[in-house]
Amino acid sequence: MKVIRVTAAVCAVLAAFTVHAAKLVVTNDYNGVKVLVNYDESRIAPYTLEDPLTFVDGRKVKSQADWRVRREEILEIFAKEMYGVEPPKPEALITDLVNEKVTAAGFAIRRQYKMYFKADRTGPCINWILWIPRWAKKPVPVVSFLNYRGNHELVCDDDIPVQTGWTRAGKHTDGNRSSERTRGMMQDANSDSIFPLAMILARGYAAMSACYCEVSPDPGYNQKPPYEQKTFAYTGVFDLWGKRDESRTDNITALGAWAWALSRGLDLAERVPEIDAKRSVVTGCSRLGKAALLAAARDERFAVCVPNQTGGGGAPLAKRNYGENVNTEIHAFTHWYCRAYDKYAPDPAKLLTFDQHMLLACVAPRALLIEGFDTSRWMDTEGEYLACKAAAPVWKFLGKGTMPDVPYPDNYDLSAIGDSFGYVRRSEDHGISGYDWQWMLDFADRAFGK
C-alpha cells in the first residue's frame, strides 16, 4: 500500500509555526484513570498515514468509479473501528408544523416542527426550528446544525419553548435542565458562540437547527445515576434501535446518532418548497462539529460541510497523539466511540490502520472547510492542517479545486482556503464566532457559484 510518511522532522517544522512555546505533558483524571495528554511537538512519535487513494489490498484508485468503492471501504473502517455502524433510516418520518410566523424584523418566516419516527407519533421526538428569507424569489440554500441547550437560545423569541428534558449543564442552566435565562443568549455579541441570523438571511440562506440533547443525551464521564454515561447516553433516539447487543464492538454511538439526526434534518429541508436542499451546508462546533463532519462523510446529500473546532476524533490526526487523543476520548467520552476504538489507545501511531484524513476525504468531491481554534492546544490545529494536506490529493484526483499548497497558515490567514477544500483557524474563545460564520458563508457562496 502506498503510504504518506510523516517523520519527527516534519513535526518539528510544524512546531515552529505554533504560538505555544511551552513543552509539557499533563495528566487528566477520568474517574481514577490517569491519562497522559501531550502538548510537546518533540514527543510526537514518527507515524505513517495510509493513502486514501489506495485500497486496503494495495490496489490504486484509478477512476471515479474506483473512488466510490474506496470511499465505502473507508466508511466501513470508521464504522467498525471508531464511530460504530450507521443507524438505519426510520420506519417513518413525520414532520408536523407546530407554528409559523413572520419574524426577524419582517425579514424571515420562522417555522417550528415536531419530528417523529413512528407512524403513530410515539417514541422519540426532535423539535426543529427553521428560518427562511421572506423576500427570496426562488428556493434558497440552507445551513443546518445542532445546538447545545435548546432552540430558545438561538434568538430572542418568546414563542420558542424552553428545551425540556435532560440538558448538558452550563453556567446558566438549572443543573441538567435548560433555563429561561438562556433565551436568546446566542444573540449576545459577547457570547463564545453566536447565531447571526440577520446576516445569514441577508446572505440568502435559510437556517435550521435542533437541540442535540433531544437526539440523545450527552452525560459527562463523572455524572451519577440516573444520568451515568454507560446507560443514560443510550436513550433518546437509541430507543428506536432496540436493545443494544453488548457483545458487539461496533454498536451505534452518540456521534453516529447526532450525525443521523442531521440527515433527518435534511430530510425535512427536502420537504420545504422554499428551500433548495441540494444546496445544503452542515456545520457544528466542537463535538457537534465532529457530528457534522461524520454526517457529511456518510450522507452525500450535504453539498458543503464546515465543521468548526472539532478537536480530537474529528479533523486532527489521531496518530499524532497530541492534545485530545484516543486515550482521553475513550475514557472521557465512552459513548461517542464504539468499543473497537479502545484497542488503539496504547499506541495510536503504531496501532491505528486509518486516520482522520481518510474521513475528510470521504466528503470529496463535495466542499469541505475545516475551521480550527488555536487558543487551546487540546484542539491540535497542526494536526488538523496535516489531515487536510493528506486528504487534499483526493479532491485533485476527482478534478475539483483542492486546498492551496501553502505553509501552515497563521490565525485569520485565508490563504489555505480553496474553492472546494480548505483550512482556516483563529484565536480567542472556543465557540462558533462571527468570523467562523463569515468564512463559512463565503466558502459556501463559492461552492454554489453565488
What are these regions (language model features)?
Residues 237, 304-359, 384-407:
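Mobile cap/lid helix-loop segments that gate and shape the active-site cleft of serine hydrolases
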Residues 22-86, 443:
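N-terminal pre-domain segments of enzymes
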Residues 7-16:
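Bacterial N-terminal signal peptides
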Residues 364-379, 426-428:
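Conserved strand-to-loop "acid loop" that flanks and positions the catalytic carboxylate
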Residues 145-264, 268-271, 314, 318-320:
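Cap/lid segment of the alpha/beta-hydrolase catalytic domain
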Residues 257, 263-325, 348:
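Primarily recognizes the serine-hydrolase "nucleophile elbow" in alpha/beta-hydrolase
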Residues 332, 336, 389-450:
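C-terminal catalytic histidine-bearing segment of alpha/beta-hydrolase fold enzymes
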Residues 127-129, 138-148:
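Short beta-strand element of the alpha/beta-hydrolase
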